[in-house]
């Protein structure tokens, strides 16, 4: 994140996450290799995103705003990742396909990657 722009690094991690989810959406009857690669890339992309994400927080929000931001976003992220997303994947798996769930979440990751560009640095 220091050599590259932190926002670019966060966007690249989100795009890598989207690619991983697209690989995970490949039907296992076709091949299991894309899904296995997707699982590895998905875990790696989320591990890589946190250091530059906190740097972006520091660049875009003042020291007074950062505790409020983190105290609001971290519980919300936990609710979404531990409740909303698994529910959505299960719902799609039950009524549609798991691939649809992974592709939808990949689209959300692409939207997140694009939205990072609109964060303004504090002055």
Predicted regions: what is each one?
Residues 2-14:
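Cytoplasmic membrane-interface "Motif A"-like loop-to-helix N-cap segments
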Residues 9, 69, 92, 100-105:
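Alpha-helical transmembrane segments of multi-pass secondary-active solute transporters
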Residues 15-29:
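C-terminal ends and interior cores of transmembrane alpha-helices
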Residues 23-27, 42, 116:
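MFS-fold secondary transporters
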Residues 32-48:
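Hydrophobic core of transmembrane alpha-helices in multi-pass small-molecule transporters
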Residues 48-61:
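Intracellular juxtamembrane helix-capping segments at the cytosolic ends
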Residues 54, 98, 105-123:
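Multi-pass alpha-helical transporter architecture, strongest
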Residues 60-96:
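A late C-terminal transmembrane helix in Major Facilitator Superfamily
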């Amino acid at each position: 994140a220091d050599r590259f722009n932190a926002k670019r690094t966060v966007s690249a991690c989100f795009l890598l996450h989207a690619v991983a989810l697209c690989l995970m959406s490949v039907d296992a009857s076709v091949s299991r290799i894309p899904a296995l690669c997707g699982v590895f890339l998905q875990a790696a992309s989320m591990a890589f995103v946190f250091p530059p994400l906190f740097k972006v927080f520091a660049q875009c929000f003042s020291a007074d705003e950062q505790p409020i931001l983190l105290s609001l976003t971290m519980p919300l992220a936990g609710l979404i990742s531990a409740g909303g997303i698994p529910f959505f994947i299960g719902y799609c798996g039950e009524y549609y396909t798991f691939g649809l769930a992974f592709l939808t979440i990949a689209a959300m990751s692409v939207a997140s990657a694009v939205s990072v560009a609109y964060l303004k640095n504090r002055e």
